[in-house]
């Protein structure tokens, strides 16, 4: 990639239909883990106008009112009025869970290659990434795209912008100079709103546009990056019909929003609704943990990790490090340090990051990475000092 370029990432709010589905799936996982943290969970959700469908595979000793968990999640998000197309009180909730396949369970429970005998729950490849563009060691475009929709929800819920409704999307186009963030070229923010905020079907009131720019966008984005920035606020105009009424929502359809905004590859596996024996989730968290500690240690300015697994086998097929020429030691030496300092077997990951806890509902909106939350153990940089010392720095 050239040193001077534009790069764009997007995010969506907690009221986006796919994120409603993700949050219901993870709320169900948390409710199960509160009672039985050894459960096997693959909880999928579909949301549509007035309808929620819960399906997937769950093996547990927990007794959970799945319908109530779904309703509580929809209420927390803010869909509490039939005008919004889905209302937590009156929506239909259908439940169709099966148990985990015995064929899968035997491979996961009895891996043959290691005394840490939890095998991977499926084959697959996962990526982790970190860079020095923000203090959180995240790419700037996705980090700030998340903060925009997060603030939209905050101002909606606290009543400062009462005309906002739950569904929203953001997009940040960053200008890079010499490979580093220089300024924000364009911000797109589309937010659902009450009917009185549009002058016509294609034109919003000036007061609406001004409020979005002044109250949501400018307080979130670094002032020094707002140089001749273009603002596109509800560029198609009226956005009253939204959420599950506007589009059918499904768990696992926002995997780039959930990760790095396209700044690095994605293995294809979604996170929400999956217990940590599913390496789609746990190994992606571990790969972020590894990459973040490498950058925090000063071994590289940016770091991409790939790991891959075979179903029922504990040890990863590969651990590959790529620093795009920013490493202070060769990438293969960094990869060797990773193998020495991180246990990337599924059970090792679960122990290392303390993943058998009801911590997942919070991850299901505004990104799984780059957030300094106490539950987000994969965001710690507690291995950085040891890595730095081992590298001789």
From Swiss-Prot:
Binding site for K(+): 44
CC cofactor note: Binds 2 divalent ions per subunit. Binds 1 potassium ion per subunit.
Binding site for ATP: 16, 167-169, 238-239, 247, 253-254, 270, 274
Enzyme class: transferase
GO cellular component, as recorded: cytoplasm
The keyword Hydrolase appears for this protein: no
Binding annotation for L-methionine: 57, 100, 247, 278
Cellular localisation: Cytoplasm
Region Flexible loop, residue ranges: 100-110
SUPFAM superfamilies given in the database record: S-adenosylmethionine synthetase
Major site of localization recorded for this protein: cytoplasm
Record GO biological process: one-carbon metabolic process; S-adenosylmethionine biosynthetic process
GO MF terms held by the record: ATP binding; magnesium ion binding; methionine adenosyltransferase activity
Residues annotated as binding Mg(2+): 18
Membership in a protein family: Belongs to the AdoMet synthase family.
Name of the protein: S-adenosylmethionine synthase
Source organism per UniProt: Acidovorax sp. (strain JS42)
């Amino acid at each position: 990639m050239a040193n001077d370029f534009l790069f764009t990432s997007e995010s969506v709010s907690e009221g986006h239909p796919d994120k409603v589905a993700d949050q219901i799936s993870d709320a169900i996982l948390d409710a199960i883990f509160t009672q039985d943290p050894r459960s096997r969970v693959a909880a999928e959700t579909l949301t549509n106008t007035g309808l929620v469908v819960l399906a997937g595979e769950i093996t547990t000793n927990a007794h959970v009112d799945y319908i109530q968990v779904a309703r509580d999640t929809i209420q927390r998000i803010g869909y509490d009025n039939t005008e919004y197309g889905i209302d937590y009180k009156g929506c239909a909730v259908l439940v169709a869970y099966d148990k985990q396949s015995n064929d899968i369970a035997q491979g996961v429970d009895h891996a043959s290659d290691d005394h840490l005998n939890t095998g991977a729950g499926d084959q697959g490849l996962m990526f982790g990434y970190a860079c020095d563009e923000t203090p959180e060691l995240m790419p700037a475009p996705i980090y700030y795209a998340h903060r925009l929709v997060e603030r939209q929800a905050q101002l909606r819920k606290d009543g400062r912008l009462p005309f906002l409704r739950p569904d929203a999307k953001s997009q940040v186009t960053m200008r890079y100079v010499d490979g580093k963030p220089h300024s924000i070229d364009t911000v797109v923010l589309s937010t659902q709103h009450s009917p009185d905020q549009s002058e016509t079907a294609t034109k919003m009131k000036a007061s609406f546009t001004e409020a979005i720019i002044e109250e949501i966008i400018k307080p979130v984005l670094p002032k020094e990056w707002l140089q001749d920035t273009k603002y596109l606020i509800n560029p198609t105009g009226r956005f009253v019909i939204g959420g599950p009424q506007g589009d059918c929502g499904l768990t696992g359809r926002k995997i780039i929003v959930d990760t790095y905004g396209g700044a690095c590859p994605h293995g294809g596996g979604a996170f929400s609704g999956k217990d940590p024996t599913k390496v789609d989730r746990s190994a992606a968290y571990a790969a972020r943990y590894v990459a973040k500690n490498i950058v925090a240690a000063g071994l590289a300015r940016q770091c991409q990790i790939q790991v891959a697994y075979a179903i029922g086998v504990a040890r990863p097929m590969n651990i590959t490090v790529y620093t795009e020429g920013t490493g202070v030691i060769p990438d293969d030496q960094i990869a060797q340090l990773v193998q020495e300092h991180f246990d990337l077997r599924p059970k090792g990951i679960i122990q290392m990051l303390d993943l058998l806890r009801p911590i997942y509902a919070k991850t299901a909106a505004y990104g799984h990475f780059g957030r300094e939350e106490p539950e987000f153990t994969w965001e710690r940089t507690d291995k950085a000092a040891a890595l730095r010392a081992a590298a001789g720095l």
